[in-house]
Amino acid sequence: MDVFRTDRIRNVVLLGHGGSGKTTLAEAMAYLAGMTNRLGRVEDGNTVSDFDKEEIKRHFSVSTTLIPVPWDKVKVNVLDTPGYFDFVGEVEEAVSAADAAIIVVSGKAGVQVGTQKAWNLCEKYKLPRMFFVTDMDVDDVSYRKVVEDLTELYGKKIAPLHFPIREDGKFVGYVNVVKQAGRRYIDKAGKEPCDIPEYLNEYLEKYHDILMESVAETSEEFMDRYFEGDEFSVTEVSAALATNVQDASIVPVCMGSPINLRGVSNLLDDICGYFPSPDKRSCNGISQKTNEIFEANYDFAKTKSAYVWKTIVDPFLGKYSLIKVASGVIKSDDTLLNVDKGEEERLNKLYVLEGSKPIEVPELHAGDIGAIAKLASVQTGDSLAAKAAPVLYPKAVISTPYTYKRYKAVNKGDEDKIAQALAKMTSEDKTLRVVNDAANRQTLLYGMGDQHLDIVVSKLKERYKVDVELSKPKVAFRETIRKNSDVEGKHKKQSGGHGQYGHVKMRFEPSGDLETPYVFEQVVVGGAVPKNYFPAVEKGLQECVLKGPLAAYPVVGVKATLYDGSYHPVDSSEMAFKMATILAFKKGFMDASPVLLEPIVSMKVTVPDKYTGDVMGDLNKRRGRVLGMNPDHAGNTIIEADVPQLEIYGYSTTLRSMTGGSGDFSYEFARYEQAPNDIQAKEIEARASKLEAAE
């Protein structure tokens, strides 16, 4: 592939609801640009984008794919992203590397939750954007309805650039609103001028007025001319669009049928004409030599630097670090410093990726997106720069996973293989996490949803030939006491010869601090227990609080006071006093009204106002306590509640079902609280075998 200068590059991410047609659009772009000799179909599993076996099997994208599309002497780096919410991390990574977005809307389904999430992501990253409405070949699709819905949501900045011409319900051409001209399709990719059907004149006038009003609002001069009734020329309209699309004050709407290659060439023309090249966008890092802001701004004349926005780990091809060049020109024989790790890396080769196909290139200019193979120290988010001018770039903010399940190997002996495989997968997928829960002797797999975790299991089997099974995780209960007790513990074995003797009298009471296992005090007078045995008593306590007498859970919030006892000058030992303490603890704990504590999480649930009642009702069923509700800037309600961790298992799926995918939630551990009696009884019964094993 040719090397492209910065001003001839467009980095465009495809966003939208799952099933809206992003991958089909990307495939049509690649075909029209001559990159493929056949138009692949998602259903047939032969598209450039969806090459992963899971994607082919499931007929939807699960990872971001890069397709560099050459068009009119411009390279359009198309980032095709998943639409399903479980793979939002892939989307966030792609957005961090993009300079503009196409939000794809299915004409059949209309504006969906994923459409609005895509818009919000563009707002967050201040990305220029266009809408592309697909499925125009379907007879009953209403383009006007989609435009009206978008305008209702986002106001007058919505500006349709094209609308369809239909004959007998068939999509046969389109009207160019800027040029006020009709075009008829003559074959899959061709078109010719045609008259605008009379029935469409009212819509042309309507959409042209919308566009002119949008253009007029971009400057005082245009506004004055608009009110004076002046017409803007095509050149003026195009120039205004180019300026104002880039600051998102105008958001064009295009349409077509990618499966029939219709409307796709128009979209590529608009991408090249209206979207910014990287050097029109800002990109700042911190110089590690001066600690001052380094304004890279994708300037090819500045010192070379880049950031890694994604990692791909392929069992056969190896590891690829996907970079965006922030400044300068990076060449295949460069040696760059991994600024995060302080290690130098020799590049050897540079690539651009066409789906799964790496194509070697000699250099990448500022703003371009490429790949480097086998960088040992480099991870997603790392910065690369010349050693003489190290620059650190901010890392993309990736969503935190809250759905988790317990996993274990199906076949004994596979544990190490699974751990190694998951290490590779977590380097590739930043929303996948592995957590070792030592207290409950389980390993947890965190992801963005059940579908995400199911695909992880499938990939482990397909790629790494290991089987794991997922199950409901155990919750980390704790044990404490509510009352006081006064007990003694005596460990005595004297059967001739050197015996064992330890005797303690102790008081147990709540310490009031549920974050600390125990507090130990000694108030022994007169040497009833010599001071040199106090550490042995504490060792006994330390051992006891690891597994409590009630249900073998860790103990918290206990104050233990050693106030008396006795010893034998020959038979007493540290071990004897430790054993005496263990006996005292078990009796004293059970005599002090022991209870199980369950973990409580502080949860924030963000939902559209219309779902607030349903969500609150569900939280109440989960024993949640709603603490407050607050509006946000996007017409949503943020519900704050304390909920037992035991009750949030599966919440991601439930919330998605209740809100049609529009709800989000987060939580963090808050504290421990006494569990209800029925929960305690059930848990104590279930843990009886562990208590017996601890005896």
Where are these regions (language model features)?
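Structural and coupling elements of P-loop NTPases
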Residues: 1-695
